[in-house]
Amino acid sequence: MTKTLPKDFIFGGATAAYQAEGATHTDGKGPVAWDKYLEDNYWYTAEPASDFYNRYPVDLKLSEEFGVNGIRISIAWSRIFPTGKGEVNPKGVEYYHNLFAECHKRHVEPFVTLHHFDTPEALHSDGDFLNRENIEHFVNYAEFCFKEFSEVNYWTTFNEIGPIGDGQYLVGKFPPGIQYDLAKVFQSHHNMMVSHARAVKLFKDGGYSGEIGVVHALPTKYPFDANNPDDVRAAELEDIIHNKFILDATYLGKYSDKTMEGVNHILEVNGGELDLCEEDFAALDAAKDLNDFLGINYYMSDWMQAFDGETEIIHNGKGEKGSSKYQIKGVGRRKAPVDVPKTDWDWILFPQGLYDQIMRVKADYPNYKKIYITENGLGYKDEFVDNTVYDDGRIDYVKKHLEVISDAISDGVNVKGYFMWSLMDVFSWSNGYEKRYGLFYVDFETQERYPKKSAYWYKKVAETQVIE
């Protein structure tokens, strides 16, 4: 049976400042930790990325032409405050005013994120969000933006608090490149959630117009053998690390007993302790019912198996299928079911996982108000022929995820939109330029844009709300 989506559903495309803009030192922009980290550790940099800093009018014109009526944009904190605090950079402020004006001119609603992996270097090198002073700096930056950019109707505090802690302190593929420090992972999650809560409360108390929420990456975690209690436990612990700890902070304003039992077990095995203060919980509690929406970023699921051994994680950054490894002491290891498709980067493609995650939010956090799927898409080594890409695999992937969103809406969940990652090809944090996600192909040499087959398909779905 053909499935449909509501008439007012947003069909969006997603971007991020550092992955799209380029111009990393232009017009007074301050450095971010990624600048040097990429130079030192990877075979690519964020220059020129998709040159969105100069070419946003082209991308927004294409958006309008192809039925994309929403865009996720992030503000580069170091374009506004080059050192994260103190002096404002007027050219950065002007750039974002111009960008938002162009969005509205093209009838593409901007959903604006304050922090998308790019803490200014001056603050990042001083502990990033492990340093509680950074909470104050973030809240001050947020307040400046709320006041300055009154044309924005949808604000997001953070993009993917989970993968930041994971990338910086567990896998070590994000600066500062620390591995296997679970206490830092949870502390980073916690301090960022306090920052989120403080900013949301400030937004509501300040009477600013518009809506505010947060974007969480929520990869669904399943036991490899659902009949084995040890595998079930491994999936629960892995879910606490990546999802439940952060969701509890967002919607409960505290960590449930079950969550803390899991956290304490993980830290007992791996070492370290957390600094959780009473005023933190007061801040979390004050904001728990104020979130206007939850953004869910979903690409894949994981299956967990009980495991007794030392932690070892190998990140597959080059798309060499089967080269990744993930096992955490006292938690478990990822083991892929044979019958579920995987990408070259070992991502397990399972649309049902998105449905299950959406239903989990509704069941466990009934004070959620609405959901946007703020990222979902398929990374490919695209083959550019005839000035396009015949990306049927991407179409199939997005179609199946839109279908489960339709199912979730039918089953009573308030899902209001979908943002495909990514609007145009951008650079990927830990995979460079080979892994493409866009609706529009970018020739990174010339910066020309070419609509892919998926763009024409997406346009039809956006115009008809019929998924076929």
Swiss-Prot record:
The keyword Hydrolase applies. Its EC number is 3.2.1.85. GO terms for biological process: lactose catabolic process via tagatose-6-phosphate. It catalyses: a 6-phospho-beta-D-galactoside + H2O = D-galactose 6-phosphate + an alcohol. Pathway: Carbohydrate metabolism; lactose degradation; D-galactose 6-phosphate and beta-D-glucose from lactose 6-phosphate: step 1/1. GO terms for cellular component: cytosol. PANTHER family: GLYCOSYL HYDROLASE, LP05116P. This is 6-phospho-beta-galactosidase. It comes from Streptococcus pyogenes serotype M2 (strain MGAS10270). The lineage of its organism: Bacteria, Bacillati, Bacillota, Bacilli, Lactobacillales.
